[in-house]
A protein has these predicted regions:
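Mid-to-C-terminal secondary-structure elements
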Residues: 49, 172, 185-210, 216-342, ...
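Short, strongly hydrophobic transmembrane alpha-helices
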Residues: 87-113, 117, 354-357, 403, ...
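Short juxtamembrane loops and helix-capping segments at transmembrane helix boundaries
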Residues: 110-125, 130-135, 260, 266-276, ...
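Small-residue-rich transmembrane alpha-helices
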Residues: 106-109, 360, 396-468, 509-510, ...
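Alpha-helical transmembrane segments of integral membrane proteins
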Residues: 58-90, 329-334, 363-389, 393, ...
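Negatively charged linear elements and acidic catalytic determinants
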Residues: 1-94, 289-291, 312, 466-480, ...
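Interfacial "coupling" helices/loops that link adjacent transmembrane helices in transporter permeases
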Residues: 355-399, 477, 774-816, 820, ...
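Membrane-proximal extracellular/periplasmic loop immediately following the first transmembrane helix
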Residues: 118-170, 282-287, 302, 327, ...
C-alpha cells in the first residue's frame, strides 16, 4: 500500500476507487462464467457490493490514521474560515508577522552578542585579568595594568598562558603604501596574543619574542579587511615593507577573514612592553587562558598569591589592598551592550504579549458572531474538546502564517536596527539571521497561538446550544459572562501599553534634557577634521607648530572660510586629563583637570564667550611667558574663594599664569569626578586651554590617545572639508586627513545611544498604544452591534443621541482608566530597567506619568467614540420592526 495514502486524501480516494472497480470487474467476470449475461452479472455484482460511497468510507475508516484524518479535516476547515473573513485574517497575520519579526530580530541580536560563545577555541576558558581594591568591591574592577604587573603575571603565574595588549589608537595612525595614504587603527600586542586567542594568522606568522622586546625589529600583521581594501588582496605582500606612523614596518602575517576583530583594528604591531614610558602607567590589558588541566579557580589562586608586589609602582595608600582575578572575556565584552539589548527585548516581549491579547479579544468577538455555527456543530455531535481543538488549530494556522511572514519581517527589522544602531553599537553590524532564529520564529508562532487562541476557544466551547440555535448570533452566552473576558483583555492591553509609554516618556524626557543643555558655543557652520600626529615625522614641537601655523595661514585665505583653529579634541567628546596644582597653595596635593592646546583663534571660531580677563592670542608664543585660559567650572570648583585670574598653576610643561576665564562647553564625560559635577552623558568639567606653541613639546606624548582637530567655520561642510585637505596637503602631502564632520554631527553622536533607545522604545510604545486602541475600538464596535436593538429602543423612548454616545464611549474610557492605573503601578517596577539610561529625570517623574495617563485616556476616548457614532445610522422605527 502506497505511503501517499497517509498524506493525500485525493490519492487515497483514487486508490480505493481503483481497487473497488477491480473487485467489481473480477466478480462480474465470475458471474458471467456461471452463465449470467453481462447485464445480469453487472447488476448482481453492484447489489452484492452495496453502496460504493459507503464502502469507500468504511475502507477509509479501517485503513486511515484517525489522528491525521481529524487534524487534516480541521486544518482544511481553518483555511476555509480564513478565506471567509479576509479582513480579520489579514489583520491577524500582519500583526503577528510584525511582532514575531521584531522578536526574531531582537533575539538574533541577543543570541549573536550575549548568548553565543565567542568564535575562539574553548571560549569559556578565555578571560581578562582584572584588578580591584578589596574595600571597594569587585564591581569596581579595572582591566588596565602597568608594565610591572604584566611582567609578574607573565613570569610568575605558570598556570596561565597570557598575553598583553596596549590601547588601540582610537584617533588612528598614518599608513603609507606607495603614493596612497590612509588613517588606520593600530593595536600593539605581545608575541603570544594570537596564540592565547587560539587564532593564528591565515597567511604568514605572528610576532616572535625578538620582535616583542623593546627596540626589536618592526613587524606588522594586517587584518583581512585592510589587506583586501588597501593592498588589493595581494598574496605576496608578506615580507614586504610599509610605512606606519612614518616608520618602515615589515608585513609578517594576515589574519583570517572570519577572525572577530573586537576593536575594529586594522593592523597589529609588537607591544614591546617595559616598566618605563607607557608601562609606567596602567595602559596595558592582559588576556589569559588557563593551561590544560588548570581550572579558572586554580589560576586565580596563583594570581592572588602574588600579593601586593605587582602594584608596587602604582603607589596605592597603605590601607588599601589590591587584588588580581579573572573576568570571563564574554562577560567583559558584552558589558556595554547587555542593558540596551535586554531593555529592547523586554519592550518587544511586551508588544508581543499585547498583540496576543489583542488577537484573543478579536477572536472572542468573532466567536460571538460564529455562535450559531459552533452550536450547530455541537448539536450534531461535536464535543467540547473537538470545538476547542478546531479553534486552536485555526489560531495555530494564523500564527504559522504570521510566523512565515515574520521571518521576512525579522530580516527587514534587523536591517533597520543595524542601519540606525550600527554606528552606536558596532557589534550590531555583524549580526545575521540563521537557523537558530528560524527555530525561535517557529517557537514563537506556536506559543503565541496558544496564548491568544486558548481563552476564545474555551469560551466558545461553553456555548448554550439551545440559546444559540434559538437566538441571533452572539447573545447566546447569557449575562455579563459574555463580556468580562474581552473587557479584561482590553484592560491588560492598556496596562501593558502604559508600561511602554512611561518607559518611552522617561527616555524622551532624558533626551530633551540633554538637548536643552547650552553647548557653550555656536555649532552652526562648524566643520571638523582630525589628523594623526603619532608619526615619526612629527617628533618635535617645532615640526607640529609649523604644520599648524602654515595650514591655518592657508585656510585663512581659502574661499568660503571665515575662520579656523586647531584644538586637541572637541566639545561633546572626551578630552585629555592632566594633574596640576596651584603654585601659591603650599598645601595643594594636586588636582585633576581636562586640558587642551589651542592654535589659532579657537574661541572666536567656535564663538566661546569670554567671561573675564583675556583670550589666548598669536602673541602667546614659545618665547613669551607661559599662560592659560580656564573655563568657569575650573574657577568654580578650584578657586571659589579667590579670583582665579593671576593665579599660577604647575602642570605638564611647567608653570603658567591664568589670564582669562571663558564659558563652559559640554563634553562627553570627564574621566574624573568632583562633588557637584554632573555625572550624566554630558558634563562641563574643569578645563584648561594652553597655547599650542607653549605646550606641544610637553604634550606631544598624548597623541597616542588624542589627535589635533582642525575646526573651520565656513559656508558649507563641503567647502570646509576641501579647504582643510588642501591646506594640510600643501604643507605635507603624505599626511592623511580624517573624515570631515559637521559639528552638529559630533554633537548628535554624543547622544546617539539615548536617541537610539528613545526611538526604538518609542516606536514599540506607539505600536502598543495602537493595538490597545484597536482593542477598545473593537470592543465598543462589537458592543454597539450586539446592542443594536436595545439602543434603538432607547432612542425610540426619547434618549438623546449625545447621551447615548457618551454612555457607550465612557465604557471604553473606564476600561482604559483601569488599565492606566494598573499600568502605572507596573511601571514603577519596570522603569528600573532603564534607570541607568536616565539623566536629570526621576524614575517616578510625575510629569511623565501624568502625561502618559492623559494621553492614553484621550486616545481611548477617540477609539471609543468612533464606533459609538454608528448609532447615528440607527432608525428606531426600523429597529423596532426588526
Amino acid at each position: 500500500m502506497s505511503w501517499r495514502r497517509f498524506f493525500s486524501r485525493a490519492a487515497r480516494a483514487r486508490e480505493r476507487d481503483d481497487e473497488m472497480r477491480a473487485h467489481l470487474a473480477l466478480y462480474t467476470e465470475e458471474l458471467i462464467a456461471r452463465g449470467r449475461t453481462p447485464e445480469q452479472a453487472a447488476r448482481e455484482a453492484r447489489l452484492a457490493f452495496g453502496n460504493p460511497r459507503a464502502k469507500l468510507e468504511e475502507v477509509d475508516r479501517m485503513n486511515a490514521l484517525p489522528v491525521f484524518d481529524v487534524l487534516g479535516r480541521d486544518v482544511r476547515y481553518a483555511f476555509r474560515v480564513m478565506r471567509r473573513t479576509p479582513a480579520f485574517t489579514a489583520t491577524a497575520i500582519v500583526t503577528l508577522a510584525l511582532v514575531i519579526g521584531a522578536c526574531t530580530a531582537v533575539f538574533t541580536l541577543a543570541d549573536a552578542i550575549l548568548l553565543r560563545p565567542l568564535p575562539y577555541p574553548q571560549p569559556e576558558r578565555l578571560a581578562y585579568v582584572e584588578r580591584w581594591i578589596a574595600s571597594y568591591g569587585r564591581d569596581a574592577a579595572a582591566l588596565s595594568h602597568d608594565g610591572l604587573t604584566w611582567e609578574m603575571i607573565r613570569d610568575r603565574v605558570p598556570s596561565l598562558h597570557s598575553a598583553a595588549y596596549g590601547s588601540s589608537f582610537g584617533s588612528g595612525v598614518n599608513l603609507v603604501v606607495g603614493e596612497a595614504t590612509a588613517i588606520v587603527r593600530q593595536q600593539r600586542v605581545s608575541a603570544d596574543y594570537f596564540s592565547v586567542l587560539g587564532v593564528p594568522p591565515r597567511v604568514g606568522r605572528s610576532f616572535t619574542a625578538d620582535e616583542d622586546r623593546p627596540g626589536g625589529p618592526p613587524a606588522v600583521v594586517l587584518s583581512d579587511r585592510l589587506w583586501r581594501t588597501t593592498f588589493g588582496g595581494d598574496g605576496n605582500i608578506v615580507g614586504k615593507g610599509v610605512l606606519l606612523r612614518g616608520e618602515p614596518y615589515t608585513v609578517v602575517g594576515i589574519m583570517p577573514s572570519d577572525f572577530i576583530n573586537i576593536d575594529e583594528v586594522d593592523v597589529w604591531t609588537p607591544l614591546q612592553a617595559s616598566q618605563r614610558g607607557e608601562g609606567g602607567g596602567t595602559n596595558f590589558g592582559v588576556i589569559a587562558r588557563p593551561k590544560p588541566g588548570v581550572t579558572i579557580d586554580q589560576a586565580e589562586m596563583e594570581l592572588l598569591a602574588l600579593g601586593q608586589e605587582p602594584f608596587r609602582n602604582l603607589q596605592f595608600r597603605s590601607d588599601l589592598t589590591a587584588l588580581l582575578g579573572l573576568r570571563p572575556m564574554q562577560d567583559a565584552l558584552v558589558e556595554g551592550v547587555r542593558e540596551p539589548i535586554v531593555m529592547l527585548g523586554a519592550a518587544v516581549g511586551v508588544v508581543l504579549l499585547i498583540a496576543c491579547v489583542n488577537l484573543a479579544a478579536l477572536l472572542l468577538a468573532r466567536g460571538g458572531s460564529r455562535a450559531k455555527e459552533i452550536a450547530t456543530r455541537m448539536a450534531l455531535g461535536s464535543g467540547r474538546r473537538a470545538v476547542v481543538r478546531q479553534l486552536m488549530i485555526e489560531a495555530l494556522v494564523l500564527a504559522l502564517a504570521g510566523g512565515a511572514l515574520g521571518i521576512l519581517a525579522g530580516q527587514l527589522i534587523l536591517q533597520g536596527l543595524q542601519a540606525i544602531g550600527g554606528q552606536t553599537f558596532a557589534e550590531w553590524e555583524r549580526v545575521a539571521l540563521d537557523w537558530r532564529a528560524l527555530l525561535v520564529t517557529i517557537g514563537l508562532a506556536g506559543s503565541t497561538s496558544l496564548v491568544f487562541g486558548l481563552v476564545p476557544a474555551v469560551q466558545a466551547s461553553r456555548l448554550n446550544v439551545n440559546a444559540a440555535l434559538g437566538e441571533s448570533g452572539s447573545r447566546s452566552i447569557a449575562g455579563a459572562a459574555r463580556h468580562w473576558p474581552r473587557r479584561l483583555l482590553v484592560v491588560t492591553e492598556v496596562a501593558l501599553g502604559v508600561v511602554l509609554l512611561v518607559t518611552a516618556g522617561l527616555l524622551v524626557r532624558t533626551f530633551v534634557e540633554l538637548q536643552r543643555l547650552d553647548p557653550g558655543f555656536n555649532p552652526r557652520g562648524l566643520t571638523t577634521a582630525s589628523v594623526s600626529l603619532l608619526d615619526a615625522r612629527y617628533t618635535t614641537g617645532e615640526q607640529m607648530h609649523l604644520l599648524f601655523e602654515r595650514s591655518l595661514d592657508r585656510l585663512s585665505r581659502a574661499p568660503g572660510v571665515q575662520s579656523a583653529a586647531v584644538s586637541l579634541g572637541l566639545p561633546y567628546e572626551r578630552l585629555l586629563n592632566l594633574g596640576f596644582r596651584f603654585v601659591d597653595a603650599a598645601d595643594d596635593q594636586g588636582r585633576t583637570t581636562n586640558a587642551t592646546y589651542v592654535a589659532g583663534d579657537l574661541f572666536g571660531t567656535m564663538e566661546i564667550p569670554l567671561r573675564r580677563g583675556r583670550l589666548l592670542t598669536a602673541a602667546d608664543r614659545e618665547t613669551t611667558a607661559p599662560v592659560a585660559v580656564v573655563n568657569e567650572s575650573f574657577a568654580r570648583f578650584y578657586s571659589k574663594e579667590r579670583d582665579v585670574i593671576g593665579r599660577r598653576i604647575r602642570m605638564s610643561g611647567g608653570e603658567r599664569e591664568i589670564v582669562g576665564v571663558v564659558g563652559n562647553v559640554q563634553q562627553r564625560g570627564s574621566g574624573f569626578y568632583l562633588e557637584g559635577m554632573s555625572d550624566g552623558p554630558l558634563t562641563s568639567p574643569p578645563l584648561v586651554y594652553v597655547p599650542a606653541s607653549q605646550a606641544i613639546d610637553a604634550m606631544r606624548g598624548v597623541h597616542v590617545w588624542f589627535s589635533p582637530v582642525w575646526v573651520v567655520r565656513a559656508r558649507s561642510t563641503g567647502e570646509a572639508a576641501t579647504a582643510v585637505r588642501d591646506a594640510i596637503s600643501s604643507v605635507d602631502p603624505l599626511l592623511p586627513v580624517g573624515q570631515a564632520r559637521a559639528m552638529t554631527d559630533v554633537m548628535a553622536r554624543a547622544t546617539a545611544e539615548q536617541r537610539l533607545l528613545m526611538t526604538l522604545v518609542g516606536v514599540l510604545a506607539a505600536a502598543a498604544l495602537l493595538l490597545a486602541a484597536i482593542g477598545i475600538h473593537g470592543l465598543i464596535a462589537h458592543s454597539v452591534a450586539e446592542r443594536r436593538r436595545e439602543l434603538g429602543i432607547r432612542l425610540a423612548l426619547g434618549a438623546t443621541v449625545g447621551r447615548t454616545i457618551r454612555g457607550i464611549a465612557l465604557g471604553g474610557v473606564a476600561l482604559a482608566a483601569i488599565g492606566a492605573v494598573a499600568g502605572g503601578l507596573l511601571s514603577l517596577a519596570a522603569v528600573r530597567l532603564v534607570q541607568s539610561f536616565l539623566w536629570n529625570v526621576g524614575e517616578r517623574d510625575p510629569l511623565t506619568f501624568t502625561l502618559v495617563v492623559l494621553f492614553v485616556l484621550v486616545v481611548s476616548a477617540v477609539a471609543s467614540v468612533i464606533p459609538a457614532l454608528r448609532i447615528l445610522k440607527l432608525d428606531p422605527a426600523q429597529t423596532l420592526r426588526a
